[in-house]
Amino acid sequence: TKMKLNLRFLKLMLLLFILPLQMLAAELGEAGKLLAALPGVSDVETLKSTHFPEKYVFFIKQQLDAKDASKGSFEQRVILCHRGFDRPTVLVTEGYNAKYALREGYIEELSKLFDTNIITVEYRYFDKSMPSPCNWDYLTVENSLYDLHHVNQTLHAMYKGKWIATGISKGGQTTMFYRAYFPNDVDISVPYVAPLNKGVEDGRHEKFLQEEVSTKENRQKVLNFQLLLFRRKAALLPMFEKYCSEKQYRFNAPIAEIFDYSVFEYAFAFWQWGEDIRKIPTNDATDDQ
């Protein structure tokens, strides 16, 4: 009869709905199942890892305005590398997107040293953590710190050991600000290369690069190389353009300006990354070198 057909159809639809959920649950390990059951957590997906027995990417619901829930919410992307429930946890505080943490071989320095879990939190308004519609009024440091606090409070249900916050560059700044706003959230804070800027134009960097970093002799070697690049610009620019084309780099300015900018920025980049001063080409080097 019509009623029996409706019941059969309903059972079929329920079966089609439940089976994918069962298949998903079967793919999740112990940590993944606990993660998926946490409030506000959604779209838990298994990732491959060469360093961790379980790894997942998921989303967590965050308020746009940390102090006013009526303003709406968005989904923030988080990557979890699970080592063990009895292990410490490293909370990586980003300043930009976090897609690098999706890589199969991803591991963080402090996690290597202390054999920890890793929770990498993508910064709001970047990549997959972009609110829709996009209202830039809510892209504030304070709101980003409440994002971290919410992730911390939610995942503390799984990881009750020591917590370490860490980040690099703008992520390192986030680590410092997070400690200032929520001093009891983590046990240790380890910012890497994190500037504490006095303003948009700070003024201290130029003096440091010109007068203080390394030795006078080494600073002169860097400057001499920059001047050499400008003297040979006519010969080097076609090579530079070819290199950028092969790497599929795209710029919003003429390639000659990009060349100049790269030369001007060389001193900052050189001292930032700590290259071997002996490898810098001198006046007798060929254009290819």
Task: Label every PLM stretch briefly.
Residues 97, 124-127, 196:
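Alpha/beta-hydrolase active-site loop signature
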Residues 111-128:
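Conserved alpha/beta-hydrolase
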Residues 138-156:
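Alpha/beta-hydrolase active-site loop
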Residues 159-169:
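Alpha/beta-hydrolase fold nucleophile elbow
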Residues 167-177:
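Glycine-rich nucleophile elbow surrounding the catalytic serine of serine-hydrolase chemistry
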Residues 177-289:
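Alpha/beta-hydrolase
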